[in-house]
Amino acid sequence: MSHSAPPKPATARRSEALTGEIRIPGDKSISHRSFMFGGLASGETRITGLLEGEDVINTGRAMQAMGAKIRKDGDAWIINGVGNGCLLQPEAALDFGNAGTGARLTMGLVGTYDMRTSFIGDASLSKRPMGRVLNPLREMGVQVEAAEGDRMPLTLIGPKTANPITYRVPMASAQVKSAVLLAGLNTPGVTTVIEPVMTRDHTEKMLQGFGADLSVETDKDGVRHIRITGQGKLIGQTIDVPGDPSSTAFPLVAALLVEGSDVTIRNVLMNPTRTGLILTLQEMGADIEVLNARLAGGEDVADLRVKASKLKGVVVPPERAPSMIDEYPVLAIAAAFAEGETVMDGLDELRVKESDRLAAVARGLEANGVDCTEGEMSLTVRGRPDGKGLGGGTVATHLDHRIAMSFLVMGLASEKPVTVDDSTMIATSFPEFMDMMPGLGAKIELSDAR
């Protein structure tokens, strides 16, 4: 879908206690990879709990365009894959809409095939840099025709046979790591990724689960060496996708901020590379109880019981950024209601998300009376524990779903209402948000504000 749909502003107002039990939609990272690896594997893959947001569906469509058979059967998605090395050249450009993850991972997956593959996306995705993924692919022999600055629309022309490479990832990016590993699937020999700072590791865990010959070694300095032997066989799997921790963040922070709240969130992914927000909120004094911790499909999963809490400001260690990069906007909202100062640093990755997310958060906070300072890659927020004087502003969301949801959470606890200029793009990651939150007692509604 393109974001040419008319914008739908929404407003959140101060709410009474939020109570109830919810199950969060499936994790976006695991959902993307389930479609990709299922579409590539031999035999049948069955997925339940898939996040059916537009981003993930676009990844599924791309796999279909390259030969995978995908159908919905009740609550499950059934995929009959093509077999590793057997993707077909798509007849038309692959349209990823707003999905950076889907686009970048698929570039890795198809780049080493001897075929031409074109990628297009919406206005927001077409602004985002793709060079970080294209550079290692070029080293493997892939030719690239791209818009200026290595942006989409772009076309990859694969080599007859790709070269295996050893690639040191220059920034903390799971997408770059994953793209190189996926390119290695169709490359003879061993492709190695060296990762100085660990990022979410779903690609490694899931590829091993599908039968790839992949090993991970961590040296004494914490640097990870990930090796994949190409041209092996992948076998279809059964996957139950756990709830997305990045989506969990919104009802979780809302329950912490709205007085008297007591909310249980079921089936949340607790992979240690994704729990930076929960750790940070607990340091701030959040009452978050981890219940029924268990393993599901090789991933840590648990239920969370969250109660309203008085929060205090903290300094968030910059090395925690990779494990909570998508959660900083909603952490900034929590910080706005915490006593004292919260300092977030090492946020350079936020500048190249769906929007310049760091600037968007700072502008939104200022528009709603929050005392904050934006640095080059940092944000400092000075909180108002009672929410007095906060709210009353309209936030420019810049087509960014996480900005929209974060500021709607803010309005539930601020003295005055908070309006976001558009809520349509929330559907890219959390289509149920606008119904699920009012189900807990949140006062969020579409507004006529222009």
From Swiss-Prot:
Binding-site list for phosphoenolpyruvate = 28, 100, 128, 175, 357, 402
Q: Which residues does the record give as 3-phosphoshikimate binding sites? A: 28-29, 33, 173, 175, 326, 353
Pathway given in the UniProt record: Metabolic intermediate biosynthesis; chorismate biosynthesis; chorismate from D-erythrose 4-phosphate and phosphoenolpyruvate: step 6/7
Against InterPro entries, the record matches this protein to:
Enolpyruvate_Tfrase_dom (IPR001986), Enolpyruvate_Tfrase_sf (IPR036968), EPSP_synthase (IPR006264), EPSP_synthase_CS (IPR023193), RNA3'P_cycl/enolpyr_Trfase_a/b (IPR013792)
Q: Which reaction does it catalyse?
A: 3-phosphoshikimate + phosphoenolpyruvate = 5-O-(1-carboxyvinyl)-3-phosphoshikimate + phosphate
Describe the task this protein carries out: Catalyzes the transfer of the enolpyruvyl moiety of phosphoenolpyruvate (PEP) to the 5-hydroxyl of shikimate-3-phosphate (S3P) to produce enolpyruvyl shikimate-3-phosphate and inorganic phosphate.
Q: Subunit composition?
A: Monomer.
The protein depicted here goes by the name 3-phosphoshikimate 1-carboxyvinyltransferase
